[in-house]
UniProtKB/Swiss-Prot annotation:
Descriptive protein name: Isoleucine--tRNA ligase
Molecular function as annotated in GO: aminoacyl-tRNA deacylase activity; ATP binding; isoleucine-tRNA ligase activity; tRNA binding; zinc ion binding
Stored Pfam families: Anticodon_1 (PF08264), tRNA-synt_1 (PF00133), zf-FPG_IleRS (PF06827)
Record carries keyword Zinc: yes
Organism: Prochlorococcus marinus (strain NATL1A)
Family according to the record: Belongs to the class-I aminoacyl-tRNA synthetase family. IleS type 1 subfamily.
Cellular compartment(s): Cytoplasm
Any GO BP: isoleucyl-tRNA aminoacylation
């Protein structure tokens, strides 16, 4: 129906200036590269960041920082870790806890030493002394710390940046020496010859945590026959019973070979015995050419296939009967025994007979000690065979030694087969090169001495996810003693003195205490700078000529593993045990374990109450990030943008933080350009919803204009109750470290509950009503309460946006910062869950109507939903009850069903309409949509039958006329 108002189009008044349009300085775009640093400066200026948590009066909460390594640029793993920690700390701070987060750095170790050496030419290296190297390494580490610290700050991470802990600090080194001393006094530290993981490329021993196992390593595996020289009498008797034809006329067994399998041919020269399991069943088997071998019965078929020879079983014997066989070495003129090993000898692989070189394997070493075998190390620090290997001296065990030895085994008739074998093999995590087992004199922590206490302590800790407990339990249960010495310069020295002309070691309470005191004042450099006489306590000065300093340094895992001793058990406002340790899942064998072992050894309990782990950051295709794949995502590029801003836009720190909150970090997490776009979209939705709330509060002062909660319309009361539910849900999410639930809940709240429902309905109240109308003020009351809560709820994650919102709330607030307000609480008056069932039914009906209206728009039958009239026949009791519930209220023309459905008119029941655009019947209602009757109000866009009679305003409805004339 056409509008027949008499005013010409030219003379009609415009009503834009009479509407309450949005006004706010809170931009649609974050402009994060400029705005976020401004907000960080505001926090520093007002002492709101670290100082806020420190000045809280609640109970202390301590998240102890696992120190990142002070080398290299920050990557997505750093971002995932540090942002997770910051989310937790900010949440605990807002809850009123006393939070003192002390960030730390691991500053010693080979990678830094190598960086220093790589930056020098040959002449500089030739002039390099240990102390010069240490000075350069310290300077390098401190520079790296400064750069990484700047990055963490830019991410919005709060912490005691003025007083971080560094493992190179004097006090830290002194505390570490004292901890080492306490373990010495308890009998948990010893020196001994043992096979350890040795890195020829680094020329130092390595701990298990310093190893990695890349895929694709292939070894030369060999089956070797060791010719039997002599057999014990009881074995001869057993053979005579089962296969007398194998005994010759002299009563001796015909030629037979013991078959072993190994993946390290270079260890054959070091063979001292062959070990068998006395519980296993072995067999003497005969080939078609009548040659005999001894092998585990269960492995005969598999070995036959591998070597390509068919064998017939002739004699079955227990492993215990093999004890005492004497065999000849296949390469040297030497005889050795068959001995009984342990349960490490199985039939899972190999032959059931284990080539035993006590200097090159832990099980071999233990068996060697048991039988008093020679424990010789045939390899030097660089990986070359020594004179103990005879004619093979000078060959490199990782290069040419294997080929030469295999060739000689072929020539001696001892090699049955060589087969390439792909398997997990330990590599040096720093140099990315293979390691070996090598027996050397090292310092060890005797884990066996406190293993049971450590396992008990694990049970007292909450592990998240729970699988972490089983993981670390099995690691501690199965691990050997901890090799804590390293043959490097850049580290904390093991404070021991060795007798120059004897075997004695000087290491006692007096010497350790004295060294610790010296380190606390001068630092560990003095171990290299001072003479022995300057390092010994006064009572030993007359013996200075007798002693010399040790040259070993401590494993860097001992450094970081002692951080609880120098940080959380020493500094004020920190808890020991810490409330939480949070690191990557690889730290079960790293920092979690080293911290656990040192704390249990000294204090018999874990240094943490709860341990939370996260996975690794991968690319969008689930691949590990690497330069070779070209798939590295740089957190700095996420924040500031790349060289091509279209490809790599500047998202800011909050989008990075929102990504962290969005993922299931208990597993490995993907990140890439597509994911960032999705996260940015969610960020924008939260921001724009917040902007809409702020923009409608420009003329609102809560103290003056707010409406009492009890007098609010039903829709508003429902909105507050829904906000209360969201606060509960998000609080639980933060408390349980389930940040992805926060992400989902806040997104759903802003988009579904606010933008698509409450605010969609509220637009008419906000824009069209007079400024001080109850319809508008009641809605503004809700908007002000909700925006304050949203600001608080997002603050731990979207800290910059939350603060920006707070600074743009147009009325006076008692707190200068959202973080000073504290965690959002829920007033009792907000809660009324009885609304939910009715609103749910009405929203269900609203969704049907919206879908039908959308269909009309798509068919170009309608433009705005206000061009429609709706008739509904209700057939469902719940929907009918909801409509009646709303009709009973209609508070000041707010709770009107047509406004909830955003149509110009609504009819419940009555006769079906003759002319409809679309209709639908479902289980709970019959819905018809038709063109609205009447005239379109040019101010509110509703269609009304009766329009203004005022000659100046004939194009607006009577409701709008009252508002306009009152202006």
């Amino acid at each position: 129906m056409n509008n027949i108002n008499k005013n010409s189009q030219k003379d009609r008044p415009t009503y834009k200036d009479t509407l309450n349009l949005l006004q706010t300085n809170f931009g649609m775009r974050a402009n994060a590269t400029l705005r976020e640093p401004e907000l960080q400066a505001f926090w520093r200026e007002k002492n709101i960041d670290f100082e806020l948590g420190l000045n809280n009066t609640g109970e202390t909460f301590t998240l102890h920082d696992g120190p990142p390594y002070a080398n290299g640029t920050l990557h997505m793993g750093h971002a995932l870790n540090k942002v997770l920690k910051d989310i937790i700390n900010k949440f605990q701070t807002m809850k009123g806890k006393k939070v003192c987060y002390v960030p730390g750095w691991d500053c010693h170790g080979l990678p830094i030493e190598l960086k220093v050496l790589q930056a020098m030419d040959k002449s500089q290296r030739a002039e390099l002394t240990p102390i010069k190297l240490r000075k350069k390494a310290a300077a390098y580490a401190k520079k790296q710390v400064s750069q990484q610290m700047d990055g963490f700050k830019r991410w919005g991470v709060w912490g005691d940046w003025d007083q971080p802990y560094l493992s190179l600090d004097k006090k830290f080194e002194a505390s570490q020496i004292k901890l080492f001393g306490e373990m010495v006094f308890k009998g948990y530290i010893y020196r001994g010859l043992k096979p350890v993981h040795w890195s020829p490329s680094s020329q130092t021993a390595l701990a298990e945590a310093e190893l990695e196992y890349p895929t694709g390593h292939t070894s030369k595996s060999i089956y070797v026959g060791f010719k039997v020289n002599q057999i014990p009498k009881r074995l001869t008797q057993e053979i005579s019973k089962q296969a007398p034809d194998l005994i010759n006329s002299e009563g001796k067994l015909k030629e037979v070979k013991l078959v072993i399998w190994t993946t390290t041919p270079w260890t054959i020269p070091a063979n001292e015995a062959i070990s068998v399991n006395q519980k296993l069943e072995y067999v003497i088997a005969q080939s078609s050419d009548r040659s005999l071998i001894i092998i585990a019965n269960d492995l005969l078929d598999e070995v036959s296939k591998s070597v390509g020879i068919n064998y017939e079983k002739r004699v079955l014997i227990k492993g215990s009967i093999l004890d005492g066989i004497i065999y000849k070495h296949p390469l040297f003129d030497k005889i050795s025994p068959v001995v009984l090993g342990g349960d490490y000898i199985t039939t899972e692989s190999g032959t059931g007979l284990v080539h035993t070189a006590p200097g090159h394997g832990v099980d071999d070493f233990n068996t060697g000690k048991k039988y008093n075998l020679s424990i010789s190390c045939t390899v030097d620090a660089k990986g070359f065979l020594t004179k103990e290997a005879g004619k093979y001296e000078g060959l490199n065990v990782l290069k040419d030694a294997n080929s030469v030895i295999i060739s000689d085994l072929i020539n001696s008739g001892s090699l049955l087969k060589e087969i390439p074998y792909e398997h997990r093999y330990p590599y040096d995590w720093r140099t990315k090169k293979p390691t070996i087992f090598r027996a050397t004199e090292q310092w060890f922590a005797s884990v066996e001495g406190f293993r049971d206490k450590a396992l008990s302590a694990i049970e007292d800790v909450i592990w998240l996810p729970e699988s972490g407990k089983n993981r670390i339990n099995s690691m501690v249960r199965e691990r050997g003693d901890w090799c804590i010495s390293r043959q490097r310069t850049w580290g904390v020295p093991i404070p021991v003195f060795y007798e120059k002309n004897g075997q004695e070691i000087l290491l006692n309470k007096e010497t350790i205490s004295h060294i610790a005191d010296l380190f606390s004042v001068h630092g560990a450099d003095i171990w290299w700078e001072y003479e022995v006489s300057e390092l010994l306590p006064p009572s030993y000065l007359n013996q200075a000529d007798r002693w010399q300093k040790g040259t070993d340094t401590m494993d860097v895992w001992f450094d970081s593993g002692s951080s609880w001793s120098s940080v959380i058990s020493k500094k004020e406002n920190l808890n020991y045990p810490a409330d939480l340790y949070l690191e990557g899942s690889d730290q079960h064998r790293g920092w979690f374990q080293s911290s656990l072992l040192t704390s249990v050894a000294v204090n018999e309990h874990a240094p943490f109450k709860k341990v939370l782990t996260h996975g690794f950051a991968l690319d969008e295709n689930g691949r590990k990030m690497s330069k070779s794949l070209g798939n590295i995502i740089d957190p700095l590029v996420i924040i500031n943008g790349g060289s091509n801003k279209k490809l790599d836009p500047a998202y800011g720190a909050d989008v990075l933080r929102l990504w962290v909150s969005s993922v299931d970090y208990s597993a490995d997490v993907p990140i890439g350009s597509n994911i960032l776009k999705q996260i940015s979209d969610v960020y924008r939705k939260v921001r724009n919803t917040s902007r809409y709330l702020l923009g409608n509060l420009y003329d609102f002062d809560y103290k003056i204009d707010s409406i009492d909660i009890a007098n609010l319309p039903l829709l508003d009361k429902w909105m507050l109750n829904r906000t209360a539910e969201v606060i509960d849900e998000i609080s639980d999410a933060y408390n349980n470290f389930e940040f992805s639930k926060f992400f989902q809940t806040i997104q759903n709240f802003c988009v579904v509950d606010l933008s698509n429902f409450y605010l969609d309905i509220a637009k008419d109240r906000l824009y069209v009503s007079s400024k001080s109308d109850f319809r508008r003020r009641s809605c503004q009351t809700v908007l002000s309460l909700v925006i304050e809560k949203i600001s608080g709820l997002i603050a731990p994650v979207l800290c910059h946006m939350a603060e920006d919102i707070w600074q743009n709330i147009p009325y006076d607030l008692e707190e200068a910062s959202v973080f000073q307000r504290g965690w959002p609480n829920v007033p009792k008056s907000w809660r009324n869950s009885s609304f939910n069932c009715h609103v749910t039914e009405l929203r269900k009906l609203r969704a049907v109507i919206n879908r039908m209206l959308e269909s009309c728009r798509n068919n170009q039958a309608l433009g705005s939903s206000l061009e429609a009239s709706v008739r509904v026949d209700i057939s469902d009791e719940k929907v009918q009850a909801a409509i009646e519930w709303l009709a009973e209220s209609e508070s000041n023309n707010v709770d009107v069903l047509r406004d909830w459905f955003l149509v110009s008119s609504l009819q419940i029941g009555g006769e079906p309409w003759a002319e409809v655009l679309v209709s639908e019947d479902n289980d709970y209602a019959s819905v018809e949509i038709a063109k609205a009757r009447g005239f379109k109000c040019e101010r509110c866009w509703h269609y009304e039958i009766e329009m203004s009679k005022n000659p100046q305003h004939t194009n607006i409805c009577k409701r709008c006329e009252k508002v306009v004339l009152a202006i």
